Amino acid sequence: PEEMNGDSILIQNFIYNDPECLADKKASIDKTPELVELFSDLFILYPFHKEKYGHCLTKLGGGMEHQTMSTMGGFGFWLVAHELGHMWFGDNVTCATWSDIWINEGFASYSEYLALQYLDSQSAANSMMNGVQNYVMSEPGGSV
């Protein structure tokens, strides 16, 4: 990010000690710096830039962000964007109560959309948004 004046942010990944694991995950892991830079440009500088950001691979599904380190079941583009988005909305800015958790999740989901819009295409972002809308609207009696 421009505000770093040529400095960098440490991105640290903990994966299984298996050469096949690295070969399988490397392309996805390598997208992380681009996402950090994008969100730093769109929001504010990565809030924990003086420390680091990273991932810890686990056999559990999905992901869970923790300040500066996300536990990940994989490195899918949407998942990485979502958990990274929580660094700004969830870890840097937190909710007053658990009933406000939708704010954190909403911004993290919006981060997925922004990542697609800027790093893939507007068409991909629109497709994601349509898919989410169709899913929500298909749930009888579900919350919106």
Question: Can you describe what each PLM-predicted range is?
Answer:
Residues 7, 13-144:
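Hydrophobic alpha-helical and helix-loop surface patches within well-folded domains
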